């Protein structure tokens, strides 16, 4: 999915009960990409009673989340509540005023409910679970905002259109806004998920006008193997107490991938990995940054970036870096440069030697040629000049 700003919808109770001292106001932030999005209330002035739920990745590839604030019922209609949404990747800022449109309070009015009733979300298995045979991949179906009046939820699961019955439904959990959250988990086979089988969760509840169906599967398309590069700390960062080791993973498809760090065989936990970002060629890339104490880096500890993806051989690869490896690389580069200079000087020396030999040879040949010509001229003069002394004697 390309960068997309969110749509923002205010959520408010449609009635007020005299038995309820508080009311819940909500803000639905829908259909945005990529993460993250920031939600505040009254420009950050209202923080008490605020709860923002984690973002949910929809089957469309876009994210949605909701934020709820609990306020005194008596303040509805007299105070203003505004939901402030900021999505920096798309440079989108939205301010939505949440207003409760209710009639006179009456004892028989039900407790405030969210508009639309229960919502259903379907989550894929974690990439690491689908790529390691020792782990168990699961597809998870989550139903939220289930009312106390109709708490029973029925789940039906289908794999490629065929109903299956091995899913497990967890006990419902009561939420802070007096609704229930119900979760059903379906265990799937590794190869079924990787081969693109389609999983459907069908949810039925009396609070719904009709059943809700959600479908999910692995992204279609030819898998592409990721390229992994590790980057040491910059020289500027070496002045600080902690340094950053970076792992660049690029060129992979689909976006399902797992990245972890370890050192000397032990896992490292102080790292952050960006969500996969769609590149111009249709593949994805991401960065993972591990933060370590500078002393550990200077001691020569080896740190490894481990990548798991379906297009890799055995679904796994690892790239390591350490100060000693970087020094060896620098020494190798220096030796290569020295070797290149040595070769250059050798070439120059040979050229100069050959040039001097050529000059000497040419000078020697020229010298002998000049000497020969000079000797020939002298001999010729001696032969041609007449002997005037004999001629005078003969005349006398």
Curated annotation (Swiss-Prot):
Question: For side Extracellular, which residue ranges?
Answer: 1-347
A Gene Ontology MF term for this entry? Answer: immunoglobulin receptor binding
Q: Which domain of life is it from?
A: Eukaryota
Enumerate the glycosylated residues: 177
**Which residue stretches are annotated as topological domain Cytoplasmic?**
369-396
Task: For this UniProt record, give its keywords in alphabetical order, as a comma-separated list.
Answer: Adaptive immunity, Cell membrane, Disulfide bond, Glycoprotein, Immunity, Immunoglobulin, Immunoglobulin domain, Membrane, Secreted, Transmembrane, Transmembrane helix
Q: Where are the transmembrane segments?
A: 348-368
The record's listing under Pfam families reads: C1-set (PF07654)
The GO annotation for biological process reads: adaptive immune response; antibacterial humoral response; B cell receptor signaling pathway; complement activation, classical pathway
Identify the stretch(es) annotated as CH2. Answer: 111-220
State the disulfide connectivity: 27-83, 141-201, 247-305
Q: Where is this region: Hinge?
A: 99-110
Q: What is annotated about its quaternary structure and interactions?
A: Immunoglobulins are composed of two identical heavy chains and two identical light chains; disulfide-linked.
Q: What is this protein called?
A: Immunoglobulin heavy constant gamma 4
